[in-house]
From Swiss-Prot:
Superkingdom: Eukaryota
Similarity section: Belongs to the CWC22 family.
Protein name per the record: Pre-mRNA-splicing factor cwc22
One cellular component (GO) term of this entry: cytoplasm
Molecular-function GO terms, alphabetical: RNA binding
GO process annotations (BP): mRNA splicing, via spliceosome
InterPro entries in the cross-refs: ARM-type_fold, CWC22_splicing_factor, Initiation_fac_eIF4g_MI, MIF4G-like_typ-3
Compartment(s) of residence: Cytoplasm; Nucleus
GN (gene name): msp-1
Top-level taxonomy: Eukaryota, Fungi, Dikarya, Ascomycota, Pezizomycotina
Residue spans of biased composition, Polar residues class: 1-10
Region: Disordered, residue numbers: 1-166, 466-498, 708-1010
Amino acid sequence: MASADMSPSRSHPHDATRSPSPRTQSPSPRDEDGSRSPGERTPSPPSRDPSPYRSPGERTPSPSPRRDRSLSPRDQPHSHPRSRSPTPRSQSPSRRSVRSPSPRQGSPARRVDRSSSPRARSPPPRRHSRSPPLRGQPPPPRHRDAGGDYRPVRKERTPTPPPVAVKTEEEKLADARAEYQKLLNLRSQGVYLPPHRLRALQAAITDKKTREYQRMAWEALKKSVNGLVNKVNTANIKFVVPELFGENLIRGRGLFCQSLLKAQHASLPFTPIYACLAAICNTKLPQVGELLVKRLVLRFRKAFKRNDKAVCLSSTMFIAHLVNNQVVHEMIAAQILLLLLAKPTDDSVEIAVGLMREVGLFLEEMSPAIAHAVFDQFRNILHEADIDRRTQYMIEVLFQVRKDKYKDNPVIKEELDLVEEEDQITHRIGLDDEIDPQDGLNVFKMDPNWEENEEEYKKLKAEILGEASDDDEDDDDDDESESGSESEDEEQKALEIKDQSNADLVNLRRTIYLSIQSSADPEEAAHKLMKLRLPAGQEAELVSMIVESCAQEKVYLKFMGLLGERFARLNRMWMDLFEESFAKYYSTIHRYETNKLRNIARFFGHLLATDAIGWHVFSVIHLNEEETTSASRIFIKILFEDLQENIGSAKLKARMSEETLQPSLQGIFPHDEPRNIRFSINYFTSIKMGYLTDEMRTFLANMPKPALPAPPADSDSESVSSYSSYSSYSSRSRSRSLTPRKDTRGRSLSRTPPRRGRGRSYSRTPSRSRSRSRSYSRSVSKSVSRSPPRRRAVESRSPSPPPRGRGRSYDRYSRSPSRSRSRTRSPAAAPPIRRGRSGTRSRSRSYSRSPSPPPARGYPTRGRAPVSNNDRAAAASGKRRREGSYSASRSPHPPPQQRLRRGSYSRSRSRSPIPIRGNGPAGRDTGRAGPAPARGGRRNRSYSRSRTRSPPPLADAATGSRRVVSRSPSPVVGNNKRRRSYSSSRSRSRSSSRSRYRSRSPVAKRGRVD
């Protein structure tokens, strides 16, 4: 114990206990893992202690209960080599222990092991020892530093960085530009750049005069123009155009044209839309349209040289639609077409067909000569060129499209017709002109006057879009805006939205239809409909629904007619609405099927029959071949049949004859052209209402007929008759005589069989004759016709009285036009013919191949032929020389000049008796077969040969083939003496038409008019 008690007394008073110090009063600046703070000092190595080594958990047997902190040998840097398992604190290089005096020799060293238990569980250290001090020992002094060598550790101060120099704005902009340029270069190399970095750098660049800012604006312009062009369509073109003008199109016109060409080549069906967009821009900025046309033409030229079919097709289609919009003159389209068709190949013809389909209607309207030339070239290629069958079919389809008036290829669609014709500016650019495409406009170039140009375009944009006036109006509205005006605007917008949806109109129609269908009789239906509150201006919808309800029924219901009559009789407003609906439905009647058409016609027929609407509505009907369709003709037929059924034929005719209605009926019963008159007559005759056309028939019969000009007498001539009221025929006549007499026109005008008396025979067949005449006492006539054979052959013998006095021959009435050539030989010294007796011998052969025209009105058919006063005067005086060659045969002969219809060829050889006057002067031509011989009874022999290419005359009883062989004595009267001459005539003809000898009226009563 003594040794134990003395050991603490030997120690230094400072070593026994720690005096309170700031470091001892505060917790140790160790981390929770036991390491010390860097500020603590590392204690010096303690002196050797001879006392045996104590375990970490062993305490010193000091009587004082005070705990002292001392470093164990494990905690010292130079620990005993026998120390085992050092704690982690001894291995930490940053651990620094507090220096404390080591215990003296012989005194046990007190150790406190803090690693055995956590700090949270260890009791707090005692600050002061509770035990009294040892005897004979002064109390230990209390120092703040708790030892002579203890000093608080100073914290190491980090060196302050040098002050950063503040950059100026110019330096910041320079750095941003450099960074932006670096990023652009990286992006051009394919490196991905985050968009936010680019946006941040772009926001930092604000100087508009710099190259980087203008390049950013150029990229934004390019992106915007390209996006607007790509999203345009028919529905939004009106909204895209203002946005497009919002961009600087003068600066970006190259970009705009480039985007248009790319988009059009990629999507050909949108070509009309792109052409319309270009036309709108061309009205305000002509340089844009001109640049587009130049690039298109240059593009076509390059593609044509490279044989690039796809680019040629797209370019020609775009040019065609620009021509339709009048952006470029149509001459460029004509030049391209002629270039493609100059050396036709399958591809070039296909491109030309596509171009012509698009621009054909415009060329037909504006330049018909170009269109005709192009189609002639197509026709030649189709017939002569060696092209593929597919290409031939394409040309045939093109001709069919032309025949259909380009119904599927209009010039401009209605929804794209946004440019007024007078506002359009047309450029004239030829296919062979020198063209500058201005490719430099596609790339970025720095503009030193960038701000000035932008200001100028802003002014131009304000003029185009009217922004200035709009801004002023907006300012005024803002100054005077109130809550009431805002509410009115909202209500107006709401109403506009409702109008666009047509919901109210659909509901109104549904209500009207249900009211009609739920009614038992017309009065109830009218009462229900009158109770409906129709919106203002929607009265026409009620009328339309009544007609539509009637049309959709399977059969016509009189219920609907009575309902319409009830409304039409209410007041004048409803009557006018029904009359307007009549005109509307007649103009659109071709849209309805036959059953609906029938119901609508009977509905309006009921309204007209009951006088619910005025009959002046017939003014909208024009009954002719051009202005009617099959549907409209069916509508008129059913309408008039219903009128006839309701009011009767007599009343209908009387109503149609009223003077007050005649102006309104001019379209149904026309009096303008014979063609329209005949069409109306035939139409009403076909629907068994010919009695309505009596007045038109009379008018048609009395219409003046154009007269033919008289040809010269001593020359070969041709006369062509104009169209008469029935039909048109052309006639040619030529006469040449080989006799000593003058050349004259030989005509035989006959419609009746031969009779006595002085008369001129009339025929409808012109003849061309050359005559040489010799007269004999006997005549034989043979006629051969090249027409289908007749059904029967008839032989007859009958007396044929020749004409009296002048000796003119009479032919049967012939309805077939003929052109005859006859040769008559007349010897110089013919035997004299005795007074009052003469004979001719003729042989005639005729061929006919033409349909015979109907007889003209007013010609005598049976009986004595009319004789003109001039003929009587010439016969009485005997001084007038009759010239010409006449043949007495039953072959057709020419009509008078003013009645000529059609010329045909006839060649005949005839021998026939020629009646002459006994007291006529010598050398006078008194017969029709040739000139008569002088007095003394000389005989004249006549040969005539005729060939007729026309069908023989129509007959009353006989049709088909007919062969007539006749022998008849012909009494000849001259100077009150009657002589007989015998003529033998034989005719054979084949005809495909009927012969009629009786008179035929030009318009049969209530029959079809040809």
